[in-house]
Each structure stands twice: as C-alpha cells, then as structure tokens.
Amino acid sequence: MKYILALLLLVAAPAIAWELPDAVATPGAINPAVTQANIATTICVSGWTKTIRPPASYTNKLKVSQLAAGAYASPQEPRTFEEDHLVSLEIGGHPTDPRNLWPQEWNGPYGAHAKDRLENFLHRAVCAGRMTLAEAQAAVSSNWIAAYQHYIGPGR
C-alpha cells in the first residue's frame, strides 16, 4: 500500500507543482491598507476590489514577462493563463506587487476557475466572522491547493 501511495504522489506531484506558484518568485504579498480592524469598510464592501484592481495593461505585461522568464514554462499561449493574485484582493492581497502575481492556467482541476471558488469561500468566511483575515491569507499563501481541498473538497 505504501508503494502505491508513493507512486501516486510521484505521478501527481508534477501536475500539482505546476498549479502552485513558484514559492520564491511568488510568496504572496499583503495590502497594508487592509486590516482585520477595517474589513467592514474595505474587502467586505461590495465592489471594493474594483477600486484597487490593477489595469489589464499592467497584469498582461507582467504575465508575458513571467512566462518568458521561464519560471512558469509552458507550451501554451499566454491567453490560456490569468495573471492571478496568490493572496486575492478579496482577502487583502496586494494589487500590484509582483510577489503576489503569477500566471495561472485558466483550466484544469486546480486552474484559476477552481482558485476563484476558494477565494469566494474565504472572502465570505472572513466577512461573516468565521475566519480571521490572517487565517485566510495564510491558508491561500502557504498552499492554495491544500486550502481548496480542505475548505471546498477534493475534486469539486
């Protein structure tokens, strides 16, 4: 049984590794303007993220640069990626710090669409008082896939 588990980990690890950002290049960065004390007037206000979201011209340029640098090498076109915030704007991630932005594939079991589900869950939990801002930020920045599996469930 141990051998089967080890084999599964070896086969699955490269796929999961690609879906996680490079921990050195993208450790995540927090927006200092968002704190636990002010979430009611920042992230928990409908439409607040629109006021701080960087323009597509900035994120597209960064995405192309990061893909070209090889940190996120892929045979696919840049249009198949979203330049995503590791710590989402919904939970106080920094909007423009490159340490919080990375090219994430749109599709796949742990693509950008799946991460969006986790971001929405964490945002609702923080704003409802079921989780602190720091807990949500730590969950997603340490390993967003593990957080997804814990909070949303595997294969959902």
Please state what every model-predicted region is.
Residues 3-81, 90-156:
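Nuclease and nuclease-like effector domains acting on nucleic acids or nucleotide cofactors
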